[in-house]
Amino acid sequence: MKHKQVFSMNLTGPIDYGFRNDYMFRAALQLSQKALIGLISSLLHLPPSAIKSVTITNPITLGATIEDKDFVLDTNVLLNNNTLINLEMQVNNLYNWPERSLSYLCRNFDQLNKGQNYSELKPVIHIGFLDYTLFPEHPEFYATYRLLNLKDHFEYSDKLTLSVVDLKHIESVSYTHLRAHETPE
């Protein structure tokens, strides 16, 4: 018999941490499949019904102290048993995000064991939620990057995707922009 983990606290007063806190971000996604599916479907422009399964492959121990830094800060998700997604909240600009996100992306992509066929590689998506503007000369609320030919922009592969959600530009997202990226159920 499978037991569902229930996490509750008797809280009084204000909550000192928002969802930009790594622990709160991870806990919310881990506690609510609906929130996780909603987030992924909106970012990948998929109808929620297209998401058959989401599995967090590196869950945290809920209830551990929020100041504890002994947990990995990113959330790894297996989508429909086919696509690996890495979600990370980054509040402080350490001026290394491009290299850091590439490192996470490549680490997740390097998934083959000796003797496996390259056709078995799963697509990997790294999505960073940044509380700062990564490229001030190219401000954008949600940007997606892939490998492509610089001359004619032909896509080399759809197996590697990097996306950045700039939380500093959340107010700039218009209703029209949201409707343009809406997917029918």
Give, region by region, the residue ranges found by the protein language model.
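Accessory alpha/beta interaction modules
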Residues: 1-163, 168-173
